[in-house]
Amino acid sequence: MLTKCEGIVLRTNDYGETNKIVTLLTREHGKIGVMARGAKKPNSRLSAVSQPFLYGSFLMQKTSGLGTLQQGEMILSMRGIREDLFLTAYAAYVAELVDRGTEEKKPNPYLFEFILESLKQLNEGTDPDVITFIVQMKMLGVMGLYPELNHCVHCKSQDGTFHFSVRDNGFICHRCFEKDPYRIPIKPQTARLLRLFYYFDLSRLGNVSLKEETKAELKQVIDLYYEEYSGLYLKSKRFLDQMESMKHLMGENKS
């Protein structure tokens, strides 16, 4: 059965000498894999529409297993991402996180629109750290992870000074600090941002400027939480961390 849908290219894998298996995140069908025959050939009509991060319209032969991609039309190439090594690292992490954090053939139109908006924002030059933090926080619910960000996990208090307890799965207030000696100290702004990014509508994002200190706190909390609960080891995350270290070194050398 032929079916048409819009999708984002999350990943491609070479298959044989001339073919690719393309993993798409689609609005209508969720995450699906399709065979793109001949897509490795330079003059193939499927080569251009099987580029990473591309947003397009795809016509495919749908089967119970791996479908076959018949043709595609680019809607947005995300060229700005692919031409920038640093942005490619961020986008690759977003794509792999979505790929590994979702099940196949489970439609989630909200997730599709959110990831599309995330890639658009990266492509247009929005701070990639901010976009990545928001994606990481939004993906928690998709993976069935629900940190307590509205009140203290122990006494339910909504006022006071809050740190983050990875062990206890959320905010812990100053009255309960002794319950987790390994809690992560964070500033009030970081606590607000964790909550904001978890519930935030990305389409409303304006110009957000975060201090490096705030970014470091967000990164520490989110990375440790993922290590403890997600069960994911992503090669793209390691590469992204290496790229961020390189970026910081380049910044220090310039100064």
Curated annotation (Swiss-Prot):
One Pfam family assigned to this protein is: RecO_N
| Domain of life from the UniProt record | Bacteria
Q: Which InterPro entries match?
A: ARFGAP/RecO, DNA_rep/recomb_RecO_N, NA-bd_OB-fold, RecO, RecO_C
Gene Ontology terms describing biological process: DNA recombination; double-strand break repair
What keyword terms does UniProt attach to this protein? Cytoplasm, DNA damage, DNA recombination, DNA repair
Compartments annotated for it: namely: Cytoplasm, Nucleoid
The answer to whether UniProt assigns keyword Repeat to this entry is no
Instruction: Please summarize what the entry says happens upon disruption of the gene.
Output: A single recO deletion does not induce RecA expression after DNA damage. Cells are very sensitive to DNA damaging agent methyl methanesulfonate (MMS). A recO deletion suppresses the lethality of pcrA DNA helicase depletion and increases survival of the strain in the presence of H(2)O(2) but not MMS.
Q: What is its main location?
A: cytoplasm
Q: List the coiled-coil residues.
A: none
Give the GO cellular component terms, alphabetically.
bacterial nucleoid; cytoplasm
Q: Partners and quaternary state?
A: Recruited to foci following DNA damage; probably interacts with RecF. Interacts with SSB (sbbA).
* Family classification: Belongs to the RecO family.
* Role this protein plays: Plays a role in DNA double-stranded break repair. It seems to be involved in an RecBC-independent recombinational process of DNA repair. It may act with RecF and RecR. Is recruited to repair centers, foci that are the site of double-strand break(s) after RecN and before RecF; may actively recruit RecF. A positive modulator of RecA.
The miscellaneous comment for this protein is: The mutation previously known as recL16 is a mutation in this gene.
Tell me what this protein is called.
Answer: DNA repair protein RecO
